[in-house]
Amino acid sequence: MLKEERNEEAVFWYYVGQLRWRYYALGHKDKVSGSEESALMGALNQSIGTVVNRYAFGDLEQLRQTIDKAIAWDESNPNEFCPKDSVAEARAEVLEGLRELRQSTIDQADEIRKTRTENGLENR
């Protein structure tokens, strides 16, 4: 999607994927800890996550909207792989973390923009 310049769509699906992976992993620690799945997600986060977040944090208001949209999408769509009610506590914890990330883009907006500018990254 990023190569096709569908950047906002890429950010949205990345955050949906992160949300669902994290509550699956947290709710199934015994299966996931030290697993190949976990290693693959770590590699994905380092490669694709870096690129997606470099773009996403360039427009903090859009990022907040995308986080809200990802949460709403997760809420309104079933998860056949990991039903939400089977990991309700883990899901609540992950949602709280995502909401804290969203809030940090408000609380630390000036600092985020300044750091991006210092690193030669665009603020949109």
Regions found by a protein language model. Give the residues of each.
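Hydrophobic/aromatic side-chain positions at a characteristic register within alpha-helices
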Residues: 2-3
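Long, low-complexity, acidic Ser/Pro- and Gly-enriched intrinsically disordered regions
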Residues: 30-124
